[in-house]
Every structure is written in C-alpha cells, then in structure tokens.
Amino acid sequence: MTSATPTTATTTHRRRRVARKPVVGSLAAAVVLAGAWYATATATPAPKAATTGLTVTNTTVSLGAKFPYLSAGYNNTREWTRTATAAAPDGTLRVAWPASDGIHVTPLTKAGKRSGADTVVKGAKEVGGLVAHNDGFALLTRVSDSNKWKETTAALVRYKNGKQAFRTKLTGTSSHDTAPLLDGQLGWNGKKYGAYFVVHGAGGFADGHFGDKMAYVSSKGAKQSGGWGWGCSHNEGIALRAESTGAFTSLCFDDWRSGLFVSTGIGAPDNAPVVQREQCWAGYCGGTFAGRTGELVKSSSGRYATAFASRGAASAAKNPDDASGRGWTVKPKTKTHQVAVAFLKNRNTPAGKPVYLTSTAGTEHVNVHVAPYGKDRLLVSWESLKNAKCANGTCTGTFTGTHLRLIDWNGKFKTPDKVVKARIAGDIAVLADGSLTWAYAPVTPSYTTALTGASPTTKTLRIARLER
C-alpha cells in the first residue's frame, strides 16, 4: 500500500456539551451488540424495478483493513460511518473510508472494480470530503496538531501518482481554531478547492465555542483569499457546491438561530436567508443532513436543491431571553423526522417553503440524500423506521427499507417509492453518463436500540451503481 508519512493520532471527540460522539473504541473483530448491525457478506443484490426502472447493481470490493461502519449520533442514534465516492475526469473512481491506521483511498475502475492498492493517509481521522483526479485525489481530513485543546487540525491532503504532493493545515494557533471533528465538504472547480467544515475556537473572541469555516486552497496547496474564519454557530450540518466563479454555494444548520440557512460567501450572519426553521440546540438540530453533510444539486437553469430529514416548525419566534437578539425558539411540528426537499432560486436565495415527500407521523425517516438524475429529475433516497419511539429529539424503530423516489424540480413525484436492498452511506458520485455510484457496507440495518460500545467492522464494501 502507498502510505503518507505517519502522524501521531490524537484523541477524538465530538463537540463539548454534545451527546453525539464518534465510536472510536477497539477496532478488533466485529463487536456483537444487542441490536447491532451485522456485516452480511452474502446479502442479496437489489431486485430490478419493474415499474420505475430504478435498478441498483452492486460490485463487491475486498478491503485490506477493517472498516468500522457505524458511528453514534446524538443520543447515540445509529448512523453510517461516512464513505466518500468520487469520479475522476477520466471516469475512474476513488473511495475514501476510515480504518484504525488512517484514511484509506481505494482506486476503482470505471466499472467499480479495484484497480490497485489503497493509498493510506496515515494517522488521518475522518473523511471530510474527497475529490478524484486522474493522477490521484485530494482529501479533506483531520491530522494531529499542537494546541491548547490537544485536538486535531483540519487539513487538505493532495496525492499525485501515489505520493503526497502537499498537506495544507486549515486551522491552527494563528487563526485561533482547531478541528476536533469536520462534518465537512470539499469542492473543486478545476482551479481551486473549497473546504467547508466545523471549527472549535482556541483563543480569541470565540475561545471554547464551535462555529464553521470556509477555506479556499489553490491546486498547489496555497491558501487563497475568500471564505471566512467563523460563520454558522455550532454548525449542525453542511452542504457545499463548487462554482466556476465566485463564492462556492453553501448551506448550514445553525443552533442559535435555529434552522437551515444560506451561507454562500457570507458565513451566515444574522440576516442570512432562511431555508427552514427547525428546533436546534448545541449539538442537535431537528433538521439534519445524513451524517451532518448534505448535497446541493444544481439545475441547468441555475436553481439548486437539497434534501434533509425535518421535524418542521409549528411555531418560530425570536427568543426574548436572548440579549444578543440572535436566538430563536422553534417548536417542532412533528416528533418524527420527515423527508424534506428545499430549493434555491440561485446560490443566494431560497425559493419558497420546502416540499415534504413523507407525512406518516409514526414513521421515522433517516439518512436522506439527493442527487441529479438526468436533465430534469432528482433522485431522493431515505431509510424508514416504523413504530417509531421518540425521546429528546431522536427516534428508534424497526427498519423497513431504503427508499428511492424520482421528483422534478418542483418537488412533484415522477415515480412511486422503490424499496431497494442497497444503502447509501456517504457521498454519491455522478458519472459522465449521468449514472450514480456510491460505496456502502454490506450490512442489514437495525435501528431498534441506541449504539453503545465500539462499532462492528467489515472487510468488504459494496459499490452500487444506478444507471440513468
């Protein structure tokens, strides 16, 4: 395997005052827990869709290390550990996934088959975003650092032809920030990278608080102008899309103003455009992207779409007890999360209220994703849990399937739900012909209990493909 220079691993944790934590315990053989998700190497392939044409095919890739495929969310809810799949201009693929020795980037052919040994970014923590190049990749991740909190720093790492070309740290002592987690996104417009991620104040005006940061980096690893050092408060969810010119389009879930906001080029100040109000507090938001990293899809006419799990807002008003005048109090509309799709007129302006694709009160909806599907349709995916039992903002329930549905750019259904056996566990890559591909662990989900202890592991990934 090709490896980066080893770095000393640091203890990782989620934000302070937050129940959400990564599972970083022993990565020995799969831990069998009551209600755990079990690796099922012999899982059957997804059935063909007779009416919608949404047929998911799978290729199995063997891994050289154990992949801990679960993470604990708020209240230790079960979440997929993020993988990132990206397509290079020549059509080949890269898949990034974490292991005990660092972040592995697996090279694949256009057909989704392994084409070589993994590149291992030694000591790196967390897949924060991935860009595939013909000669390698760029990875947003966390690496060890020296700071007052003894936390990791955000870093953009570029590999060319199996060797590290640069490693640019994006937080540090001079900027008074660290990155104990990223929940990030990475974009590339052919000239520069845009990295959007969570930061922890380490000195200065924001000492001890959590916010977010947008940083631009050149193709050679030099920091560029633009972006911001402190934006959305306690960012609870990030979406980013690269643009050929100007600021990259971005969204964030903010706990203080309680909801989803446009942060494009402005870092989400008090007057940031509101996409949706949600009940949020430090470490939690009733509206959420899958794993707190969402997708932004752009239409040919310049509109945008994003999808998220939402509890909605029965009421929303400024908090009279907040002397800053910035805080909001939101009462959620539902106990369970429903599937919402929101649209923007352009990179700065929301287009009306979100459209809800589900409305069943007793069913919880998680792991919501959206991707382009052809010229004028969107693929929305989610997982459903029946007989939901909810407390303190999160729910458990009985898993009933992964749903695929096509909608148009007005949110109107173009197909009924199609329940498939594949899962979506991270970033989706769009291929040159419009087909979609992603990586996921071959496991049977269970959401009936919270996740405690270390994550179970697998040594295989499924590479799913959905033809356009």
Where are these regions (language model features)?
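N-terminal export and membrane-targeting signals
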Residues: 8-29
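Short linear sequence motifs
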Residues: 30-31, 297
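Extracellular, repeat-based ectodomains that mediate carbohydrate processing or recognition
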Residues: 47-468
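C-terminal region of N-terminal signal peptides and the immediate post-cleavage residues
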Residues: 14-18, 34-50
